[in-house]
Amino acid sequence: MLLEAAPVPDERTPLYVPRSWVAMAELGRAFVGRRTELGRIAAAMRHPDLSGAALIGEGGVGKSRLLTEAVRQVCRRHHFVVCAAACQATSSVPFGAFAQHLPPEFTGTAFNGGSLRLAADALIGRAGGRKPVLVIDDVHLLDPASLALAFQMARRHEAFVLAATHSAEAVPDPITGLWTSGMAEWIEVRPFSREEVGEVLEHALGGPAEGMLVQRCWEATGGKAFLLRELVAAMLETGTLAPADGVWRASGPFPVTLRLAGVVDRRLAGLGDDCRRVLELLAFGGPLSPDVPARLVSRPAVEAVEALGIVEVTRLGDREQARLTPSLYGEVLRARTPRLRARRVREELAAALEAGPHAREDLRRVVAWRLENGVRPPAESVVAAMRDAWAHLDHELSAELAAHAVAAGQGTRAAEPLGYGLMFLGRAREAEERLARLPRPAAERDRARLACVRAFNLAFGLDSVRAARALLHSALRDVAGVESRAEPAAVLALLDVATGRCRAGAGLAEKVMAEAPHDSRAHCVAEVARAVALAFLRPPEESFPALERAREPALRHQAELPWLEFFLELGWVHACLLTGDFPRAQARAAAAYDRAVERRFPFAIAWFCLLRALAARARGELREQLHRCREGVAIARELGNRGLLALLLGQLAHGLALSGQTAAAREALAEADEPAQRSLWLLQPWTELARSWVAAAGGSPGASAIAERAAALARESGAAGFESLALHEVARLGEPGHVLDRLGELAGRAGGDAAPQYAAHAAALVTGDGDALAASSAGLERLGSPLLAAEAAAEEANRHRAAGNLAAAAAAAARALRLAGPDGARTPALEALERPRLTRREREIAELAAAGMSSKEISLRFVLSVRTVENHLQRVYRKLGIGDRAELASLLDLFHPGSHPASGGDMNRAA
């Protein structure tokens, strides 16, 4: 038999449930954000003068879900909820929306004053003394009798009306009247923000989503909850969405399933041919000047689709742009357009743009459409389009157009878009092969630039530092002109800095800056290289101004050399980290990451994931560190970028070690070491510090010695700030006496606030002075590192406890637990923290008392006598060394079970 009947499943047969079904269910249940809206609903229900709240918003933004959550969180406990069934079918039946809540005789009852009073009394009677809440979705579909009933009960304060309607629909006059008379709150429900889309995805998928996936989903759906649910289901159903390295990622374009297409079809149902034609043009060509579809179709059609909210017209500078909103409609329309018709649409768009006034970016699209249709544009047009695509970070298109330019004999002009474009696409080996085959340029300047792009790709794409350096030296021998030599020399200076030779790199950069024209690319690259070197070598009063001066030239040349931003932000973040401004470091890294996500630039995202992870590490935000490492690892692995991958794996190992996942940490560190990266050796001390914490997590002896080797690496390169940080790690790992003198020396040399605080912490650890540890904790908190402050407070608590000062010990322990936060980092100091030894019942009673509950209320909660509760509290006071509830309230953090791992882990034996 070709087909066999499937066995009938019994109760023991596991049923396969598609992941898309699970995600759909989770997305349906997910409720994130909307705290403001829920708060306004709750406040309106408490307000004595208000009898209603109306939720207004576009279709699909989540008004119905908000109603459901409001009922669950706000209404259920103290109110009688009456859900109306407002729909087209009941809109002509008197009291039809409330039929299920009224006696049978009301169905079809004549609508008059008497029937309104009887219906209101029936609902009030069913409420059993509670105030009714009339919950009405799609209030514009209410039948007149039900609408009048809701309005009258609200006017008389007999019920609270909680209604929702589409912003495109006319809100019924009675509901509007409640608002204009000051009896109802008017609440606009907006689409999800990008951050909220990320929260929804994480909730539904059971793990974090990469930033670019969140950005794409937010742009595609416009933040509308309904479309987001359908899009995620389509991606899961087709396998487009899958986890990689602990983070959810999407591959390729969004899939268009029959279900997703049906959703869009229903939204566009009823549109005339002209309106559909406008949408088709925008699907293939958007954003477009609205004049283009107006010429090709008609202006009334363009105005009609804009009025329907399907097309959005915005102004960019002095130009208007029309685009589909949400953009997912364009994905669906393109996917469903037959091949020959799509070709005709592209040709019409190309001809229309060429015929009218157009901007430079229009040429890029025209060339792309022509090539997709199999038409070869003129070489000059291809080169111009290529450079524009490169400036807009469209690496796929710039590399494709560069290949066409090479075929047309324009290889010299195509070298940078070809080489950098392929490198950033994760095709660095192909980039080197194709660049190496290009004919030798005749002009010195062109030969120098070809050498620069090849060297950059060799170093930061293939991690072949020696080959990159040899190529740059060869270029310097090959060209004689000062300006031609300046650019390879500047890139060589940058390579020196990146590989940890900061002094040599800074010296070479200064020489280039002295010889090259101030507005040249060479001067800019050299200035960035010098600024990054100073971030590691000099105190903040020198490094920060240098970084600030490099910002303007880097922005000026960003279209040609987008990697300038990578190094400039690397310098900024490290300058902040090494001098003790941790919040600023985190803010800069996050802003750079957001820009990369908005540009959909994976290489840059991975780079800035590393910087975000380092900043999170400094602040002790373990979950954030792991999230950014996993996201960066997934991207770097896909791109095949060895240097970035190794550094990200090192930070991942560090985060895993601190979270107690020792085996996974060892595995990540082993992968980071095979083979060791070279192109970003400047950052290798971070990996060595990670190695020390992995050793500590496994209880291996000598963890502090590994951290000392990291400090030695930093010392060799002249990075006093980094050396100070690494020596402080030695102190944290249990050997403060070994590094105390050197930390004292660096406190006066490194600059900034970090080095003095590290030295003070080490000194307090050596002396064991509780007051000094308290001062150190406060100082470390001012740096912006709650974790370091928590460690000092934990050490203070143990010193006070050993001295018999129980009250001070309890206060310090509570502070340590509060500062450590919910991430549960496992460090020697925190694992050694001794909590007061309270029984389970003592802890429960103490927590309630600290939260403000009276002994009488506590006794009722546990069915105990008041005297028993007081006796428990007295024992708690004695164990904590305090005298009353007022002191107990300040120790609330002590009583949160699971706020930190139990003490006594392997790290206490690792130093």
Regions found by a protein language model. Give the residues of each.
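Alpha-solenoid helical repeat architecture
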Residues: 93, 319-321, 359-364, 397, ...
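Extended alpha-helical scaffolding segments used for macromolecular assembly and cargo binding
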Residues: 52, 66-70, 74, 99-100, ...
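Helix-turn-helix DNA-binding segment
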Residues: 10, 814, 828-874, 878-911
